[in-house]
Amino acid sequence: LSGFVIGYAYDDRWGRMTYRDFFKRRLIRLHPMVVMGMLIGAAAFYFGAGGPYEMIAGVPVGRMLLILLLGCLMIPVPPSMDIRGWSETYPLDGPAWSLFFEYIANICYALVLRRLSKLLLGALAVVAACFTVRLAVTQGDMIGGWALDGEQLGVGFTRLAYPFIA
């Protein structure tokens, strides 16, 4: 749906809007959610040690603050910097991985997708749908996309492609 919304909102503006204007508008629209989610996640993380999150107690505050900064800048965290034990790209705000892919989709829209013909977009949608069906059938679900490794990035891009392009 986000691809339809982006196209509907911006397709007719490109004659009087630069790439910078587009990206600025998208940052203003999306990034406050990112920062707020990271701050709430950092507070919950810091005060949530124990129970199912025993790894939290051993995380130095400085490392948590570094993860917070990286998260606020939407820089994915590699598994080696994990602080919760789940290999998430954004350990302080798990769902932020989907916004990471949304940013990528916005970049693809601005640089490539908006210039494609309807026929080519339709063909891309069919290809993306095939990848989505393949993922669901071979994996048995559509779960994934939140870790910075090849398999999870593949799931994330697959989950992004069809809904955005179609």
Where are these regions (language model features)?
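Hydrophobic cores of alpha-helical transmembrane segments in multi-pass inner/ER membrane proteins
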Residues: 1-4, 37, 162-166
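Divalent metal-coordination and catalytic microenvironments
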Residues: 3, 27, 102
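Hydrophobic alpha-helical transmembrane segments of multipass integral membrane proteins
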Residues: 3, 39, 129-132
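Active-site phosphate/pyrophosphate-handling residues
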Residues: 4-5, 106
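Structural signal for the C-terminal ends of transmembrane alpha-helices
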Residues: 6-14, 43-49, 111-119, 166
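Aromatic-enriched alpha-helical transmembrane segments of multi-pass intramembrane proteins
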Residues: 62-166
